[in-house]
Swiss-Prot record:
GO MF term (any one): metal ion binding
Names of required cofactors: K(+)
Superkingdom to which the source organism belongs: Bacteria
Recorded GO CC terms: cytosol
EC number: 3.6.-.-
Binding site for GTP: 231-236, 250-256, 275-278
Lineage, uppermost ranks: Bacteria, Bacillati, Bacillota, Clostridia, Eubacteriales
Domain TrmE-type G: 221-380
Cofactor: how and how many bound: Binds 1 potassium ion per subunit.
Major localization listed first in the record, in broad terms: cytoplasm
Protein name: tRNA modification GTPase MnmE
Keywords, in A-Z order: Cytoplasm, GTP-binding, Hydrolase, Magnesium, Metal-binding, Nucleotide-binding, Potassium, tRNA processing
Protein residues bound to K(+): 231, 250, 252, 255
Length: 459
């Protein structure tokens, strides 16, 4: 249920900072601000959508909590389409907490996670897919994932979905008139006409679904794991790719005993890359635990980067690792090529029996760009960019479009089987309902709760 009260929350991340923001939204937002804000003008005289210097004061005892900049925004030209006040204060958590507690004491309620965005949806400011784009934008890790979220926030996907749903509803209305009111002087709709129209809609929906795998990778990224024997250069590779000295690099085998991970940007693709403990037979209890974690990381990974030491060559440990990987997406690096001659590298490549390999010297930076290009080519055909096209990035949307397509196909099969149009309309109604769940035109309270619970406080 929509609670028509006034909410408040800290909208900036927790921790010390130069500036912190408290957001208030609802019918009592201005009333609360008037009681606690002391500026050059009376609060009622402050124009909407202006920033005003003043102090936050406890009205009970006159104690000053902080010097602030306050923004007053009158409905409906606000994010929530309610009266909104934003208080920009100093960023210490004590100051923020004290001002928030004062707002609550004066009549606001602590907002639930995502409640500001939920109110924007419920008040018609954005639709449900645009609301989901807000969290995608907050969580984006590359320029391309940010662009994809902004495209969805601007309503590009919504317009396509609403257009398809609107055409289905028009067809349903035409079918209803034809079936229920044959005496009316309206052009009769036939099964062939319905078949042709829903076929066009299905084609457009299929085009959107085709973009999902690419969109998913841009939004969610790839989980990649670096594996190989101890001291093959895994930690050095992680440090080289991330540009940080995150992993300890020594000549002692088995130095990395736990999982180390880093988020990096590879040609526009968010990559969560994991450095693992070297895989070998060992009696060391701690190292054994690390090896077990490595096996779990491999199972969950989208991509495995296997490193082979060119100086030591291939051995049973390497063969055992290759066998264990099965049909996992795999890139093999022959590392430390600066320490060996061409003959030794060729011998390793012949033992790998035609598997694609990249020759690298992580120490010298050789082969790193080839690795980055290989990762891109393995997951995305062509350039990783978000231009004017619609990119489907959300699995919830993809599943609902798939169900809409399935319902349309059932309707087409029914028409092929000469079923009456009033029965055909059942599947068309289902298709329209599935599309409505994407934009929020037909969605349950449980689904809304699930979506908005993923937001943090203040959003």
């Amino acid at each position: 249920m929509y609670k028509e009260d006034t909410i408040a929350a800290i909208s900036t991340p927790h921790g010390a900072g130069g500036v912190g923001i408290i957001r208030i939204s609802g019918d009592k937002a201005f009333e609360i601000a008037e009681r606690i804000f002391r500026g050059k003008k009376d609060f009622k005289l402050i124009r909407s959508h202006t920033i005003n210097y003043g102090k936050i004061v406890n009205p009970e005892n006159g104690a000053v909590l902080d010097e602030v900049l306050l923004s007053k925004m009158e409905k409906p030209k606000t994010f929530t389409r309610e009266d909104v006040v934003e208080i920009n204060c100093h960023g210490g958590m004590v100051v923020l907490k004290n001002i928030l507690e004062l707002c609550i004491k004066e009549g606001a309620r602590l907002a639930e996670p995502g409640e500001f965005t939920k109110r924007a949806f419920l008040n018609g400011r954005i639709d449900l897919s645009q609301a989901e784009a807000v969290i995608d934008l907050i969580n984006s890790k590359t320029n391309e994932s940010s662009k994809a979220a902004i495209s969805q926030l601007e309503g590009k996907l919504s317009r396509k979905i609403k257009d398809a749903r609107s055409k289905l509803i028009e067809l349903l209305a035409h079918i209803e008139v034809t079936v229920d009111y044959p005496e009316h002087d309206i052009e009769e709709i036939t099964g062939n006409m319905v078949y042709e129209e829903i076929g066009k809609i299905k084609e457009k929906l299929c085009d959107i679904v085709k973009s999902f795998e690419r969109g998913r990778i841009i939004r969610e990224g790839i989980d990649a794991v670096i594996i190989g024997k101890p001291n093959v250069g895994k930690s050095s590779l992680l440090n080289e790719l991330s540009g940080k000295s995150k992993a300890i690099v020594t000549d002692i085998p088995g130095t990395t005993r736990d999982i180390i991970e880093e988020y990096i940007n590879i040609n526009g693709i968010p990559l969560r890359i994991i450095d693992t403990a070297g895989i070998r037979e060992t009696e060391d209890v701690v190292e054994k635990i690390g090896v077990e974690k490595t096996h779990r990381a491999i199972d969950e990974a989208d991509l495995v980067i296997m490193m082979i030491d060119a100086k030591r060559g291939m051995d049973e440990d390497d063969n055992r690792i290759l066998t264990m990987l099965g049909d996992k997406k795999l890139i093999i690096l022959i590392n430390k090529i600066d320490l060996v001659d061409e003959k030794q590298i060729n011998e390793i490549e012949s033992l790998l029996k035609g598997r694609k390999c990249i020759r690298t010297s992580v120490k010298e930076g050789t082969g790193i760009s080839e690795l980055e290009n290989a990762i891109t080519e393995l997951f995305v055909q062509g350039e990783v960019s978000v231009n004017e096209e619609i990119l489907l990035t959300n699995i919830r949307h993809k599943n609902l479009i798939d169900m809409a397509i399935s319902s349309i196909e059932k309707a087409m099969e029914s028409i092929d089987g000469s079923m009456p149009l009033d029965l055909v309309s059942i599947d068309i109604t289902d298709a329209a309902d599935y599309l409505g769940q994407i934009t929020g035109e037909s969605v349950s309270e449980d689904v809304m709760h699930e979506i908005f619970s993923k937001f943090c406080l203040g959003k």
